[in-house]
């Protein structure tokens, strides 16, 4: 481990994180039906080569090959009981390359299920994360990164797992192009003040989701006002049509251009996510490391502090939610939207459902055409 904690280094200069592990593994002929996390045990030399490439590119921190090393994700490969072993192996491999020069960042990704009804409980998620965190700590990780999270409740479970094992952590969310997660969480709701019993993060973070241009637009006002330093790791973005060709716009030079913008608005650590690799990191490191400290002035009116209200319990959200929370039997009937503008037949069907005590009707989105009826309750 480096002599100076990561939390101290980010006060002095911008820290360079590495690129995507999965992208590099795929480019090295590891098919996507393989459990990438298991390669830390079966092919450690391959993982070390990728870490070494990022080290030579100028990264200050190496992220472990353990993103999906939790019991729920590993169950798909019949490896649910190997979460601790694979997490520890991933950290050990990264530490061998990092030595005492670089930081080892232990990657912990989501469990892949909704937290709450229909998925796993917050306690189950915390227990799964704690297993992975323990392995990463024992393998030599310096800091945990809870990355690509979409649900605040799941992030809080991850933070509690880090607290169990006294590990510093980075809390990183992923945003869609409209500025929210797939579960509708905004930046402000996701990074609302933490409960008093939880330790503060080393950094907040944004990773994956969108490319650098879109991400800058979404987070540039949050970064300078954030209560904690911010890490930014955009992905390579989506391809765009240029002269009838599909082209990925995020070249190393393009990523670096936006990395400089992120630093100018106050980001204290920069790296890459899906679609980026050592070439991107080399270009980025050469430009960003020369910037040293950057002063950021926050302009515009400041928002008054709002009282954070606890989310309502499930049974209070709606009559339907009350039935689900109570374990009552519910009935859903799907009614397909009409092909034209006449809703008479659709309303007749809905009336029949109501008369026969159907709990809820479901009007599906049309994946092959524009829907004529909104599936949202108005």
Model region roles, listed by residue range:
Residues 1-378:
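Domain-level signal for soluble alpha/beta catalytic cores
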């Amino acid at each position: 481990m480096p002599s100076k904690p990561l939390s101290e280094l980010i006060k002095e200069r911008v820290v360079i994180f590495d690129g995507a592990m999965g992208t590099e593994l795929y480019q090295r002929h590891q098919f996507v039906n393989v459990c990438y996390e298991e390669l830390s045990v079966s092919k450690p030399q391959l993982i070390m080569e990728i870490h070494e490439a990022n080290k030579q590119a100028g990264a200050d921190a190496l992220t472990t090959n353990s993103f999906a090393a939790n019991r729920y994700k590993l169950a798909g490969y019949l490896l649910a009981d190997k979460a601790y072993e694979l997490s520890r192996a991933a950290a050990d491999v990264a530490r061998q390359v990092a030595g005492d020069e670089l930081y080892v960042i232990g990657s912990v990704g989501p469990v892949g299920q909704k937290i709450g009804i229909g998925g796993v409980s917050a306690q189950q998620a915390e227990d799964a994360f704690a297993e992975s965190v323990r392995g990463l700590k024992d393998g030599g990780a310096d800091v945990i990164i809870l990355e690509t999270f979409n649900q605040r409740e799941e992030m809080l479970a991850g933070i509690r797992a880090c607290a169990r094992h006294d590990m510093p952590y980075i809390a990183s969310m992923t945003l869609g192009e409209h500025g929210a997660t797939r579960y509708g969480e905004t930046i402000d709701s996701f990074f609302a003040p933490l409960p008093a019993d939880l330790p503060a993060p080393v950094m907040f973070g944004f990773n994956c989701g969108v490319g650098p241009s879109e991400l800058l637009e979404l987070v540039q006002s949050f970064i300078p006002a954030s209560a904690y330093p911010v890490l930014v790791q955009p992905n390579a973005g989506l391809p765009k049509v240029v002269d009838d060709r599909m082209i990925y716009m995020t070249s190393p030079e393009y990523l670096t251009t936006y990395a400089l913008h992120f630093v100018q608005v106050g980001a204290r650590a920069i790296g890459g996510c899906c679609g980026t690799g050592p070439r991107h990191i080399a270009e980025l490191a050469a430009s960003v490391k020369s910037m040293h400290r950057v002063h950021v002035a926050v302009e515009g009116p400041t928002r008054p502090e709002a009282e954070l209200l606890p989310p309502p319990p499930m049974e209070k959200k709606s009559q339907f939610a009350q039935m689900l929370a109570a374990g009552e039997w519910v009935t859903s009937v799907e009614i397909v939207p009409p092909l034209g503008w006449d809703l008479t037949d659709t309303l007749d069907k809905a009336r029949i459902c109501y008369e026969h005590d159907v709990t809820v009707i479901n009007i599906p989105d049309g994946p092959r055409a524009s829907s004529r009826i909104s599936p949202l309750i108005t």
